[in-house]
């Protein structure tokens, strides 16, 4: 049985969450296949993707348990309900929108709420967020995460925004439970050209690097 706890565990085990902003609804499916082939199975389809709920539904139906498909850039309640109705296993908001937590938990799904400051991060966690999205991570860096977790060690932090191949190690060493990866993986050139072999190759670099770092720490 799929539960919010099992989904959170799967996301932590996956380690990398691909943040997908597809050009079209149809593009999300081959894109997701390419990510899976490269070893990345956690896929966050953002609401900046046209017809995002339909994209979530199609990818979930086609990939089944091979992927952990969620919805990203969720800022309104109607988006949250649409994502859950489409089969999203997790919901991600880039902002501190605690009102989304209850409906997601009522559906027995996981939610990641955005935060920037220590107060926002702790508020998200105390309000019931399963994970706390620190965004934009490139502005703050691994040293901020490490400093944040010193007084707040229980925070399940997922940095997103600017995570690169060479920052996987410092972010994990800072105590992050998973990493959200966007444009450094799903590059504009790949999306513009539908170059899925290139995406698979790049995804493999990220997933291999994650394994290497996890084995060393």
Label the model's feature ranges:
Residues 1-86, 106, 154, 165-166, ...:
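Conserved N-terminal beta1-alpha1 strand-loop-helix module at the mouth
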Residues 33, 126, 138-141, 145-146, ...:
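Mobile acidic interaction elements
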Residues 104-111, 142-152, 157-159:
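CoA-thioester-processing core
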Residues 90-100, 134-142, 176-196:
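Glycine-rich phosphate-binding active-site loops on the catalytic face of alpha/beta enzymes
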Residues 39, 63, 87, 95, ...:
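Conserved functional loop/turn residues at catalytic and ligand-binding sites
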